[in-house]
Every structure is written in C-alpha cells, then in structure tokens.
Curated annotation (Swiss-Prot):
Phosphorylation at Ser-67 by gwl during mitosis is essential for interaction with PPP2R2D (PR55-delta) and subsequent inactivation of PP2A. Phosphorylated by PKA. It comes from Xenopus laevis. This is Alpha-endosulfine. Keywords: Cell cycle, Cell division, Cytoplasm, Mitosis, Phosphoprotein, Protein phosphatase inhibitor. One of its GO terms (biological process) is G2/M transition of mitotic cell cycle. The modification Phosphoserine is found at residues 67, 109. Belongs to the endosulfine family. One of its GO terms (molecular function) is protein phosphatase 2A binding.
C-alpha cells in the first residue's frame, strides 16, 4: 500500500508517514518564530533565576510590599514570643440559641424619653 510513484503522479503515504510530515510542518513555523525571537532578544532565557541584582536582593532576606505587611509580620513575631493563656477549652460558643426567658430582664430607664411623651400631649396639637 505504500506504493510511491515518481514523476507527475501523486505519492501515496501510509498514515504514519502522513503524521510525521504534518508534525514536521507544524513545528517548522514555531521554530522559525523562535529563531526570530532569539535574534531579536539574545539575552532572553539565558539565566533562569534572573539578573545578578535580583538574585542578590532575594538572598538578603524577606522584603515587604508595604508598611502594612511589615507591621503584620512584626506582630506575628511578637505573638510567638509572648506566652499566652489559650482559650478555655470548656467554653463552647454557638451551641445555644437564646430564648426570651434566657435573657436578663431589661432595666427600666429612670429618665423618661421626650419622644415617648404623654398620650394627652399628642392630642392637644
């Protein structure tokens, strides 16, 4: 089935040969584009870690985006150093839903509100 005719007649190829030629054609434009980019930017991709300046800055230690990041990191360091009493293990929150009977009674106000005046005053307007 892989008969190949030379001359004006067409060439018959097997499925594998067709795939190989298609892959070569697909890779060729990519390689050409890659060569153009390498010619335009010769230093691109040489150092995987970046410039020497960047590597030096990264080796110095942690840097902060702004003063807020610095203060948050500083507060975390202080919290680690201070021994604090952990929360009560017996204290459980969110399990009990209060009812009106569970709530303490409100204390009546000693000063009467001017807004809640006498009913008689409202009728005499």
């Amino acid at each position: 089935m892989s008969d190949k005719y030379i001359g004006d007649s067409h060439l018959e190829e097997t499925g594998e040969e067709k795939q190989d030629s298609q892959e070569k054609e697909a890779v060729t434009p990519e390689k050409a584009e890659e060569q153009k980019l390498k010619a335009k930017y010769p230093n691109l991709g040489q150092k995987p870690g970046g410039s020497d300046f960047l590597m030096k800055r990264l080796q110095k230690g942690q840097k902060y985006f702004d003063s807020g990041d610095y203060n948050m990191a500083k507060a975390k360091i202080k919290n680690k150093q201070l021994p604090c009493a952990g929360p009560d293990k017996n204290l459980v929150t969110g399990d009990h839903i209060p009812t009106p009977q569970d709530l303490p009674q409100r204390k009546s106000s000693l000063v009467t509100s001017k807004l809640a005046g006498h009913v008689e005053d409202l009728h005499h307007v």
